[in-house]
Structures are given as structure tokens and as C-alpha cells.
């Protein structure tokens, strides 16, 4: 057995659980005193008179200490068991007392009192020379020490009361005229502060002045001895402000508020408890000014409590929302007396109300808009972190109307309080927030939101920028979008100006004004500089391009739609460039450590543009354009080649024809491929039935009219395909038979074929009454020659793959 284990130590299993307990303050002092004699104990260990055999015999019946042996009470108290490791035979109690007397360890309370005593001495010395700058600095230092003492439950030290009386007497005794401006300013500041603090500690000051000597001999005033500010002491680990609501009537609202303000930002402060205490204090407010200050303090505390979370919990978000709404209600009721503004001057003392301006209004420094910004951001974060396919997402989305109401209400308040020359600049942020909630919606949805928002808005407010007369027509909605975007376009910030244009283009394209939206985008030249913009702006631009393409398709402008979407759909990361990937995916693949930057790359699910709809629109346009051209090319007609992307119908048909098994259509892509095959055969009815069975068409607001226009266009393109395929076999074509075959009027048949003959320079002509088309035999290849040409091409490709070196020669 090792000699490091003492013979007298007896292991007790019942005491093993206490080994993990934290040391009390008294035990820590004993442990620190024992550590002072460690050096002497080590020496005495090696000079121990006991023999090695003694250790062996002692250890024969001993049990091991265990991992926490140094926490044992025998070790800390210096008992017989286990102390041979630290103490030799010559160790005595007198040695321990001598070592302990060499170093005095002061407690935190003693250190704090010493600092106050030092400041008191400096104030005494400064009084002799009328050095009010030093007096003010030391007095402020003592005040801060009092706050620290109350936070640690030390009460109100007597030395603090002495310093207050000392400075108060010095102010009263100072009758000399002070010429130095800095000293005079320090004197006036000290006079105001000591007056304020004296009023808070009237009882203690009166007791001190009755008998200063006996008062100084007494112990410090404890927390539970007086109803002073010490009752609001903050503990070492958590904030204990539960007594504010019951005792603020004795000490006043602002002294209690100062404790809350001093507690903010400190370590180990429970923000939830702090918010609850501030909420309780709010119930004791009496004047509108106190309520405004209380809300301006409470709301940031609520928002700060969730800074380390992915988003603010919904119950806390709703509590913050109610606080902001209540603050706006108070400001609305007292708009002619109190106003909260970012332009207000800083107020050194919250207890003193700011001076009224020439209109009799007292402006308080604060930012309602910042609160609304944070609420809106937290709302978006909660949507991004919620499963979009769950009922929780729909329930959370109901709060969008509430946040939009608050945004409109804030805009009305700022319009009423801000100076007219600064309104446009300062309202730009609220305009962006308002546009963010409506630009991507149809007029029907915006109308619902506007009506609900104006119902809860105060009737005393009128908006000069977006006037409301009770009727929400389409012209009113377009006017709101135009007014807000025009205001943003006047800003010097280039990002805001680009964003304003894109908002307007998106809304205009969504509401069936394709040509206006297209001209607006081209004139703005945003596309020329979009690659240098921030990612969120690039995502918005890509969304605008997609919406332009969909708008063109709704009007059956097939060529325009195909041209707009072709470049965008060539990307293999369509979901990412539209900002429609999940936040978890962005976090996993992003190199940025900033959560705000990652969230800018994502949009809530209800703002997404359905990717299936984008695919079906583009492939349908590709089908109507490329199938007739492919047929004309294979029939020997020289055509102009057009670029095609990976998602074009031409590429899809190439893969489809190479597949070994061709089953019935299952996916969206399969339905379009089978529709293309039927179109090549001239069977337009079957082709249209396959297209119509795609469920993604239901996502279009006017799907019925779009499908009707699509059917007519499909008939025309099927006619062209039929003509290119069969013109080699016929010398004459009857317009009546073609009209019956494609269910089109004869004049429409004649018009379509005449356009084809002119465009591709085909040797064909109509008779006088245009009932028959005569086709001259040209140099076009036969079907057999076409198949042979395809086989020859495949043979060449196969040879190049098998013998690549020969192919290069």
C-alpha cells in the first residue's frame, strides 16, 4: 500500500455523496489557510521521524481516499487522518496560527468598504482646494460602489451615507464664485446629483446627522432593515427584482428603474426575470412619461432575452408585440405632449422630463421603428425555422396581419411626428418593411391586408403619402406600391433604389401588366449591375425574371416567356438562386458565421414560386417552339438554330428515345414528353389532354383562360408540325380537311400556312379561293433517307468513341 494514504483515514460510503458538494464560504477560508502551510508541510514530510515499516503497518488496514479525498472534512480541518501528506511530526497549532497571520484575505465586502473609505478621503482633500472635478468623480465612484453593494446583497454601507452628507455639506458651504467653466460645471452637476441621492436616502441621512459618531460605529444597513433601494439588490448569479412593484411606491419609480438599467448587460443576469420585474414595475407607473420610459426599457429587455436563440419564442414575441402596441397607444393619446423620436436630444437624467419645444411637445429619445424592425425580423426567423408543411407554420403565418398592422400604424405615427423635410429619408426603412409583405401578393390578397390594417389604425391619423378614403380599389393598391417605391427611388442608397425598382416590376408583372413591367425593368438597367449587388438583391432580381416569364405565359406570349426563362433555367441550382432552399441547408453549406447573412439567402415558404410550375411553363413553351422546328429540320428545311438548355424539350426527347423502356407518363416531365410525341404525330387532342392533366396548372390564378389559349396555340403548332411532316407525301392539301382535323377555322389555317411558307421559303401556293394548297416537289429527303442519315450519324459518333485518336486525324 502506498504511504500517501494515511492509516487513520476511514472510508464512509454514506459520506461519498457529500464529496461532490460545493465548498461553503467558511470551508473555503479554512482550505485557503491550510494551503498557506503547504510548503512547510512538504518539508516536514521528508523529515518525518516515522519509519517505512510504520507506514506499511498502518496501511495494511486502511482504505483508499478516492478521487475527491482532498475535499474531506478531516483534510480541511487538519485532523489526524490523512494529514501526514501535508503535515510533519513537528507541526503544531501555533505554527498554523503564525502562518495564517502572515496574510490577511479580505472579503469582497471589506474591499468595497475600503474603496469607499479611500474616495471619502479624496473628497476631504479636494474640499480644501475647491476641486469640484475631483469631488464629482469620487462621488460618482461611490455611487457606483453602492450599486455594486446592493447587487451583492451588502445593503447600504454607513460610509456611503457619510459621503453623501459630506458632499451635501460641501455644496452648502461653497459660497465662492467659480470662474473656471469646467469647475463650475462639475459643481452644478455634483449639486444636482447629491440633491437627488439625498432625497432617496432621507431617513438614513437624518439618522446620521443626529449622532454621526454612533452612526459610524453601527454595522452597515442591511437589505431588510430599510425600504431603501437596497431592497432591490441583485444577487451574485441572478437578478432578484421581485420587490420592485411593492416598494417602488416608497422609493419612487425612477430609483427602482435605475437598478434595472444597471443590471442590464451584466453577466449571469436572468433576462426573463429582469423582464418580469420590469413588467411589474410598469404596473406601478402613474404618469404618461413614466409609462413611456418603462416601455422603452422593457421592450429592449424582452428582445435581448432571445439573442442567443434561433428566433424569439412565440409567447415572448406576442408579449413584445403587445408592449409596442401599448406604447403606440400611449403616444397616440399624448401626441401633443410627448413624442418619441430618433432626432430627440439625449437626456442625462431620465427622472427629469425633457424640455418642451416651441410647440409644447417634449421629445423623448427612442426608436419605435427599431422595435418594429426587430419584431418583423423575429417573425421571419420563426417562419424559416418552422416546418412549412406543418400546421404550426400556418398558425404562425396568421400573425403576418398583426405585424403588418403595426408597420402601418408606425408609418402613420412617424408621418405625424417627423419634420416634413426629413420624412422621406427616415421613412425609407418602414417603406421597405411594408413592401416586403405585399409586393409578391396579388391585388386580392393585398386588399384584404389593407382593409384589416386600416380598421385598427387610429382614426385621428391621415397619411399624406398613402391616403386612404375607405375604398381599396385596384388603382389604390397600385398607387400604394408606386408611392412607396418612388419614395425609395429618391434615396441616395443604390441598394434601396434597385430594390424599389424590382419591387415595382414584380408587382406589376404579377398583376398581368407584362409589357409595362418589362419596359420598366429595361429602362432601370438594373440587370447591368446586378452581379455586383448583395446576394439578397440578386435573389430578388431572379424572382422578378421568373415572374416576368410567368406573366408572359399567362398572356400566351410563348416566345417572350421562353426567351426570358431560358438563361435562368439553364442553372442547375434554381432553388438556391431563387432563395428557396431551407435555412438548415444554407447553414450546412455556407461559409458565413453570421446568422443574419445566412437568413438573407432564404425566403419563407409562403413567398416561394413553385418550381414545378416554372418547369411546366418552360417545357410547354419549349414544346410549342421546338417541336415544329425539329420537324422542319428533319424534313430537309434549312432553319435557324436556336440555343436550348438542359431542360428543353429537345434534350428531353433525345434522352427519352434512347431509353430502353418507355412506360406510361408518371411525372410532370413524362406528361410533357408524351404530349410532344403526340404532337409530332399531329394528334393535338391527345397532346392537349396530356398537358391539361398536369396538376401544376392549378397554381395559376387564371388557369382556365390560360389553358384555353394554350389549346388554340397547340392546334396551330400541331398544324405546322403536320405540314412539315407530310408535305413530301402530298401535292395538294385541302383547307377544309385540315380545318376538320385541327378544329380551326379555314381562314386561321390559311393564315398559319401562309406564314410558314413565307418564313421558310417553301415552294407552295394557294389557289384563287384559297381552298387548296399546291405543293411543288423539292429537294427534300424521303423518310427512308432521313432514317439512313440518322443511322450514318450514329455510326460516326460510335466510331469516334471507340477510336478517339482516329477521329482527331
Swiss-Prot record:
Cellular compartments per GO CC: cytoplasmic stress granule; eukaryotic 43S preinitiation complex; eukaryotic 48S preinitiation complex; eukaryotic translation initiation factor 3 complex; multi-eIF complex
Places the protein is found: Cytoplasm
Sequence ranges of Acidic residues compositional bias: 18-30, 37-59
Record carries keyword Flavoprotein: no
HAMAP family found in the cross-reference section: eIF3c
Function: Component of the eukaryotic translation initiation factor 3 (eIF-3) complex, which is involved in protein synthesis of a specialized repertoire of mRNAs and, together with other initiation factors, stimulates binding of mRNA and methionyl-tRNAi to the 40S ribosome. The eIF-3 complex specifically targets and initiates translation of a subset of mRNAs involved in cell proliferation.
Family indicated by similarity: Belongs to the eIF-3 subunit C family.
Entry protein name: Eukaryotic translation initiation factor 3 subunit C
Origin species: Vanderwaltozyma polyspora (strain ATCC 22028 / DSM 70294 / BCRC 21397 / CBS 2163 / NBRC 10782 / NRRL Y-8283 / UCD 57-17)
Amino acid at each position: 500500500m502506498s504511504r500517501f494514504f494515511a492509516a487513520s483515514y476511514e472510508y464512509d460510503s454514506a459520506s461519498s455523496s457529500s464529496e461532490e458538494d460545493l465548498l461553503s464560504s467558511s470551508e473555503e477560508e479554512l482550505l485557503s489557510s491550510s494551503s498557506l502551510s503547504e510548503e512547510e508541510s512538504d518539508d516536514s514530510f521528508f523529515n518525518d521521524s516515522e519509519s517505512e515499516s510504520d507506514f506499511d503497518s498502518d496501511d495494511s488496514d486502511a482504505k483508499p481516499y478516492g478521487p475527491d479525498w482532498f475535499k474531506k472534512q478531516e483534510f480541511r480541518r487538519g485532523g489526524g487522518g490523512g494529514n501526514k501528506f501535508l503535515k510533519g511530526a513537528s507541526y503544531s497549532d501555533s505554527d498554523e496560527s503564525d502562518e495564517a497571520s502572515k496574510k490577511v484575505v479580505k472579503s469582497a465586502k471589506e474591499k468595497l468598504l475600503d474603496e469607499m473609505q479611500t474616495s471619502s478621503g479624496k473628497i476631504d482633500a479636494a474640499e480644501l482646494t475647491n476641486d469640484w472635478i475631483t469631488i464629482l468623480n469620487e462621488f460618482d465612484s461611490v455611487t457606483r460602489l453602492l450599486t455594486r453593494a446592493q447587487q451583492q446583497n451588502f445593503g447600504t454601507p454607513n460610509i456611503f451615507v457619510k459621503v453623501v452628507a459630506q458632499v451635501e455639506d460641501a455644496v452648502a458651504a461653497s459660497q465662492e464664485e467659480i470662474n473656471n467653466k469646467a469647475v463650475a460645471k462639475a459643481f452644478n452637476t455634483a449639486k444636482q446629483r447629491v440633491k437627488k441621492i439625498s432625497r432617496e436616502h432621507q431617513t438614513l441621512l437624518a439618522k446620521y446627522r443626529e449622532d454621526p459618531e454612533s452612526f459610524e460605529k453601527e454595522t452597515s444597513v442591511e437589505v431588510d432593515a430599510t425600504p431603501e433601494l437596497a431592497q432591490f439588490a441583485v444577487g451574485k448569479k441572478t437578478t432578484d427584482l421581485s420587490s420592485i412593484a411593492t416598494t417602488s411606491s416608497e422609493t419612487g419609480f425612477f430609483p427602482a428603474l435605475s437598478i434595472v438599467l444597471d443590471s442590464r448587460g451584466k453577466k449571469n443576469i436572468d433576462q426573463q426575470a429582469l423582464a418580469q420585474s420590469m413588467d411589474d414595475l410598469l404596473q406601478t407607473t402613474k404618469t404618461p412619461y413614466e409609462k413611456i420610459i418603462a416601455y422603452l426599457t422593457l421592450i429592449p429587455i424582452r428582445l435581448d432575452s432571445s439573442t442567443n436563440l434561433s428566433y424569439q419564442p412565440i409567447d415572448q414575441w406576442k408579449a413584445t408585440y403587445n408592449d409596442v402596441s401599448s406604447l403606440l397607444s400611449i403616444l397616440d393619446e399624448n401626441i401633443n405632449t410627448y413624442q418619441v423620436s430618433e432626432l430627440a436630444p439625449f437626456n442625462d437624467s431620465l427622472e427629469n422630463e425633457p424640455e418642451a419645444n416651441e410647440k409644447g411637445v417634449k421629445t423623448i429619445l427612442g426608436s419605435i421603428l427599431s422595435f418594429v424592425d426587430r419584431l418583423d425580423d423575429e417573425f421571419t426567423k420563426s417562419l424559416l425555422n418552422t416546418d412549412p408543411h406543418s400546421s404550426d407554420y400556418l398558425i404562425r403565418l396568421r400573425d403576418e396581419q398583426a405585424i403588418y398592422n403595426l408597420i402601418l400604424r408606425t408609418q402613420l405615427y412617424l408621418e405625424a411626428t417627423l419634420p416634413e423635410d426629413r420624412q422621406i429619408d427616415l421613412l425609407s426603412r418602414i417603406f421597405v418593411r411594408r413592401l416586403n409583405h405585399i409586393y409578391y401578393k396579388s391585388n386580392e390578397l393585398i386588399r384584404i391586408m389593407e382593409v384589416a390594417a386600416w380598421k385598427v389604425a387610429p382614426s385621428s391619423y391621415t397619411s399624406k403619402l398613402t391616403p386612404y378614403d375607405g375604398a381599396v380599389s385596384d388603382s389604390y393598391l397600385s398607387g400604394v406600391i408606386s408611392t412607396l417605391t418612388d419614395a425609395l427611388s429618391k434615396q441616395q442608397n443604390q441598394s434601396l433604389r434597385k430594390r424599389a425598382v424590382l419591387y415595382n416590376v414584380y408587382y406589376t408583372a404579377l398583376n398581368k401588366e407584362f409589357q409595362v413591367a418589362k419596359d420598366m425593368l429595361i429602362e432601370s438597367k438594373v440587370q447591368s449591375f446586378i452581379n455586383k449587388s448583395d446576394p439578397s438583391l440578386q435573389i430578388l432580381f431572379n424572382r422578378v425574371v421568373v415572374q416576368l416569364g410567368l406573366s408572359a405565359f399567362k398572356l400566351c406570349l410563348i416566345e417572350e416567356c421562353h426567351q426570358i426563362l431560358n438563361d435562368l433555367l439553364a442553372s442547375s441550382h434554381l432553388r438556391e438562386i431563387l432563395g428557396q432552399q431551407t435555412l438548415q441547408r444554407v447553414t450546412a453549406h455556407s461559409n458565413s458565421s453570421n446568422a443574419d447573412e445566412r437568413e438573407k439567402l432564404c425566403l419563407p415558404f409562403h413567398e416561394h414560386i413553385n418550381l414545378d410550375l416554372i418547369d411546366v411553363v418552360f417545357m410547354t413553351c419549349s414544346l410549342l417552339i421546338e417541336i415544329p422546328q425539329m420537324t422542319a429540320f428533319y424534313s430537309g428545311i434549312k432553319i435557324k438554330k436556336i440555343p436550348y438548355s438542359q431542360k428543353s424539350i429537345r434534350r428531353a426527347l433525345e434522352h427519352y428515345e434512347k431509353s430502353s423502356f418507355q412506360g406510361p407518363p408518371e411525372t410532370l416531365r413524362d406528361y410533357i414528353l408524351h404530349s410532344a410525341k403526340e404532337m409530332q404525330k399531329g394528334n393535338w387532342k391527345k397532346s392537349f389532354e396530356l398537358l391539361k392533366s398536369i396538376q401544376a396548372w392549378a397554381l395559376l390564378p387564371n388557369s382556365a383562360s390560360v389553358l384555353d389559349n394554350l389549346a388554340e396555340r397547340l392546334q396551330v403548332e400541331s398544324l405546322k408540325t403536320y405540314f412539315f411532316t407530310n408535305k413530301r407525301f402530298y401535292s395538294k392539301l385541302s383547307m377544309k380537311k385540315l380545318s376538320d382535323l385541327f378544329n380551326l377555322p379555314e381562314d386561321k389555317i390559311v393564315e398559319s400556312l401562309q406564314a410558314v411558307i413565307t418564313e421558310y421559303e417553301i415552294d407552295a401556293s394557294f389557289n384563287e379561293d384559297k381552298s387548296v394548297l399546291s405543293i411543288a416537289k423539292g429537294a427534300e429527303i424521303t423518310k427512308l433517307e432521313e432514317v439512313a442519315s440518322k443511322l450514318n450519324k450514329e455510326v460516326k459518333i460510335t466510331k469516334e468513341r471507340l477510336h478517339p485518336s482516329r477521329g482527331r486525324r
